[in-house]
Amino acid sequence: MTAQLIDGKAIAASLRQQIAQRVAERRQQGLRAPGLAVILVGTDPASQVYVSHKRKDCEEVGFLSRAYDLPAETSQADLLALIDELNEDPTIDGILVQLPLPEHLDSSLLLERIRPDKDVDGFHPYNIGRLAQRMPLLRPCTPKGIMTLLESTGADLYGMHAVVVGASNIVGRPMAMELLLAGCTVTVTHRFTKDLAGHVGQADIVVVAAGKPGLVKGEWIKEGAIVIDVGINRQEDGKLVGDVVYETALPRAGWITPVPGGVGPMTRAGLLENTLHAAEHLHK
């Protein structure tokens, strides 16, 4: 058996098309286009690439895109003032602060300053709390995108055993809550977990978001399991690889995401979906 590929690139392209159509309908109705403000502090090359992709996506779907490229030495006070200004701007539905930030800045304080109804990354404690209470409003983009990927397989998720490898605030923890909401039995593993292979081997769904290339071996995967690889690691030869050993997982899994072209495009699509949702339901 060879796993079927879950093509995140194609699914994200379809979502962008649907969003663009909805934006065009809004314009025809005399409504404004959704607006997204992206704040980039410093010159981290990976962050610059991510931000350029997000701006391109906004252009493609017809959003208003506002870019703030700030020097690395920008102060906390100046950033807070900018966020306050954007919070009150009626043309902006979403505010995104690109992480990681320079060391002198407190990312928690900055993210909490974003109004929850403009927190399109879904990281504000209010939005995480809503998800935990089974009343999601703006959902963290990567877990949201992964749920769309899982739905695309046609699998009935109710009662499935899902194992999340990695317990970060950005992916692992909200991912566990999304899977609970979908009716899965959820195990979260982390750096202190004993017998990772044993946990993975029991999983009907494995979501790996540890940031460690090749952490999960293909032979650990249960026959027919759905494998979602969130990791994106650049090797010395420039090749991008995930956290799962793809070549050995492929013959065992039922479905698997490639790296690149799996989860990454869905994270960006989730950001657009959240911004549109904010414009349509939170900022009428």
Curated annotation (Swiss-Prot):
Q: Which GO terms describe its cellular component?
A: cytosol
Q: What is its EC number?
A: 1.5.1.5, 3.5.4.9
Question: Which pathway?
Answer: One-carbon metabolism; tetrahydrofolate interconversion
Q: Which terms are listed as keywords in the entry?
A: Amino-acid biosynthesis, Histidine biosynthesis, Hydrolase, Methionine biosynthesis, Multifunctional enzyme, NADP, One-carbon metabolism, Oxidoreductase, Purine biosynthesis
Q: Which CDD domains match?
A: NAD_bind_m-THF_DH_Cyclohyd
Q: Please name the Pfam families in this protein's record.
A: THF_DHG_CYH, THF_DHG_CYH_C
Gene Ontology terms describing biological process = L-histidine biosynthetic process; methionine biosynthetic process; purine nucleotide biosynthetic process; tetrahydrofolate interconversion
Where on this chain does NADP(+) bind? 166-168, 232
Question: TM segments?
Answer: none
Q: Which InterPro entries match?
A: Aminoacid_DH-like_N_sf (IPR046346), NAD(P)-bd_dom_sf (IPR036291), THF_DH/CycHdrlase (IPR000672), THF_DH/CycHdrlase_cat_dom (IPR020630), THF_DH/CycHdrlase_CS (IPR020867), THF_DH/CycHdrlase_NAD-bd_dom (IPR020631)
Q: Name one GO molecular function term.
A: methenyltetrahydrofolate cyclohydrolase activity
Looking up NCBIfam families in the UniProt record yields: PRK10792.1 (NF008058), PRK14186.1 (NF010783)
What is the annotated quaternary arrangement, including any partners? Answer: Homodimer.
Q: Describe the task this protein carries out.
A: Catalyzes the oxidation of 5,10-methylenetetrahydrofolate to 5,10-methenyltetrahydrofolate and then the hydrolysis of 5,10-methenyltetrahydrofolate to 10-formyltetrahydrofolate.
Quote the PANTHER family the UniProt record gives.
C-1-TETRAHYDROFOLATE SYNTHASE, CYTOPLASMIC, C-1-TETRAHYDROFOLATE SYNTHASE, CYTOPLASMIC-RELATED
Q: Which family does it belong to?
A: Belongs to the tetrahydrofolate dehydrogenase/cyclohydrolase family.
- What protein is this chain from? Bifunctional protein FolD 1
Source species, please? Ectopseudomonas mendocina (strain ymp)
Q: Which gene encodes it?
A: folD1
